[in-house]
A protein has these predicted regions:
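Short amphipathic alpha-helical interface segments
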Residues: 43-69, 199-251, 265
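Minor-groove-contacting beta-hairpin "wing" of winged helix-turn-helix DNA-binding domains
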Residues: 97-103
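Hydrophobic h-region of N-terminal signal peptides that target proteins for export
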Residues: 10-19
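Charge-dense, extended regions
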Residues: 227, 233-331
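Extended alpha-helical scaffolding regions
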Residues: 115-217
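Short alpha-helical segments that sit at the start of domains
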Residues: 23-52, 159-160
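Short amphipathic alpha-helical interaction segments
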Residues: 72-88, 93
């Protein structure tokens, strides 16, 4: 009896695996938006299913007329949505019959193709960061503005909110060899963006948001975006991380040197490998390498955070951590 049960179980597993790996239709709206830096405007626009349909259709090389026919959405409505996407610089018109996304559309098969490389790069980057852990701890130890914060919480805020998200991007943009400054969007906004099929985790769970208030740069880091931004007074009341000018300058200097000298060389050394991976994306025919790598790095960073949390080196917030660094004054 037991062999028969095992055989049935195996057959069910094979059948379910086949179903899970079956490709979805060429046109559907089960896609999720992500970006760096975080921009709420872009996310709001792509909450509309038909806007996502348009970008997926353009990714396939289809016209608005064909997308309307396949989706049963009225063509005038799609034209109106395209105008919104074009204004936000998330889509562009090449000519009357050709439009393209201005962000990579990442499909399930792209994820499958890069999964092994992504796991390898995430583990390597985790190991590199851990090998320099004591240097980060030593830099934070003297900060009086951090004295009331438990070590694992402080390390989360700095490592996740200021190194993996923030510091590494600044290092990439300054170096320009693998990822250049984000493309210009609406008005003065500049950000990388992506649309990922099936799984919101693959669009990036962790969100870093930054703004200025009362002479401070305020940073929020956590899963998703908080509904409302936290002000400086609330951070003070909750005895959060607040660094005045001298300590903020010292931390910024450390972060710039650390990311440039300890972490960036790994990416430069393996540049050809990273380029080979992102060139496998179907989106490579219409977006830059930088745009594809922005998504790939976001996935790496999210994976590194999972590894560090599992190792109990950092403590994630119940919702979000919010901290403040004094804006540099004239010297």
């Amino acid at each position: 009896m037991k062999p028969k049960v095992l055989l049935i179980t195996a057959m069910l597993f094979i059948a379910s695996t086949g179903l899970s790996q079956r490709e979805k239709p060429k046109l559907h709206s089960d896609f999720y938006f992500g970006s760096y830096p975080v921009l709420r405007d872009g996310a709001s626009l792509l909450e509309k299913a038909d806007a996502r349909l348009l970008l997926v259709g353009f990714h396939q090389g289809w016209t608005i007329e064909k997308i309307a026919k396949e989706s049963k959405v009225a063509e005038p409505e799609l034209d109106r949505l395209f105008a919104d996407l074009e204004e936000a610089r998330l889509a562009s018109e090449i000519d009357l019959d050709e439009r393209k996304p201005m962000l990579p559309v990442i499909r399930d098969r792209d994820i499958v193709n890069v999964q092994r490389s992504l796991q390898m790069h995430t583990q390597e980057f985790t190991s590199l960061l851990r090998s320099n852990w004591s240097e980060i701890e030593a830099a934070l130890a003297p900060l009086t503005g951090a004295k009331d914060i438990p070590s694992a919480q402080l390390m989360y805020q700095v490592v996740v909110g200021s190194i993996l998200f923030g510091g590494m991007h600044d290092a990439f943009f300054a170096d320009q060899t693998i990822m250049v400054n984000p493309p210009r969007r609406m008005g003065s906004q500049r950000y990388y963006a992506w649309l990922v099929e099936s799984d919101p985790i693959r669009a990036g769970i962790l969100k870093r948001e930054q703004w200025e208030s009362d002479g401070f740069t305020i940073v929020s880091i956590g899963k998703g975006l908080p509904q409302n931004r936290t002000n400086l007074e609330r951070i003070r009341m909750e005895r959060g991380l607040i660094l005045e000018e001298a300590e903020a300058r010292r931390l910024r200097s450390f972060l710039a040197i650390f990311t440039r000298e300890r972490l960036l060389p790994y990416f430069k050394k393996n540049r050809s490998g990273f380029l080979n991976v992102v060139n496998e994306f179907d989106a490579g025919k219409y977006v830059s390498v930088s745009s594809a790598f922005a998504w790939y790095y976001d996935q790496m960073a999210n994976g590194v955070v999972e590894n560090l949390v599992s190792a109990k080196l950092i403590q994630p917030p119940a919702g979000h951590y919010t901290y403040a660094l004094k804006v540099p004054g004239p010297r």
